[in-house]
From Swiss-Prot:
Residues 1-94 form the Glutamine amidotransferase type-1 domain. Keywords: Glutamine amidotransferase, Transferase. This is Putative glutamine amidotransferase-like protein RP712. Gene3D superfamilies: 3.40.50.880. Signal peptide: none annotated. One of its GO terms (molecular function) is transferase activity.
Length: 154
């Protein structure tokens, strides 16, 4: 989510001075990125990978000015909360789907789901394309997002 540079009301002094202990196992990237600062503190962080995580240490719903509830500020505030709501629903749906998968008869902790599937060759008119997906695609009239006769260039 992108919010233009703006002044927010931050009335608390319990703030993060630095981000630490968030490296991924491979040590190449930090999980969190600081996205809002004051002159001496980090005020907000966002996760860069995996589940969306946002940490706010200010009041995004309140401006530091008396005209805190202008239309543009209300729109900005709504975007923040809608983004949060969308993240909550996405995480919930992922958990439901994962539970359904784990409880299905096709899931096995000891066997990969595709181990018992044998590979089958594609037969198109006596296999004139030699199972080459690029040849099959180029010889077939297709429609992708409103474009017809799309070609893959080698």
């Amino acid at each position: 989510m992108s919010i233009e540079k703006e002044k927010f009301w931050a009335s608390h002094k319990q703030v993060v001075k630095e981000i630490g202990g968030t490296n991924l196992i491979n040590g190449k990237h930090d999980l969190f990125k600081a996205v809002a600062y004051t002159s001496d503190d980090i005020e907000a962080v966002e996760s860069q990978f995996g589940v969306p995580i946002m940490g706010l240490q200010f009041h995004p719903e309140m401006s530091m000015y008396s005209n805190a509830f202008t239309c543009s500020e209300k729109g900005r505030d709504k975007k923040i909360y809608l983004s949060f709501q969308q993240s909550v629903w996405s995480f919930h749906n992922k958990q439901v789907l994962l539970a359904e998968f784990k409880n299905s008869k096709h899931y096995s902790k000891t066997q990969h789901p595709t181990e018992d599937i044998t590979e089958k060759l594609i037969n198109y008119e006596n296999n004139k394309y030699n199972n080459n997906i690029i040849d099959i695609f180029n010889e077939t009239s297709v429609e992708i997002i409103g474009y017809s006769n799309v070609e893959i260039l080698n």
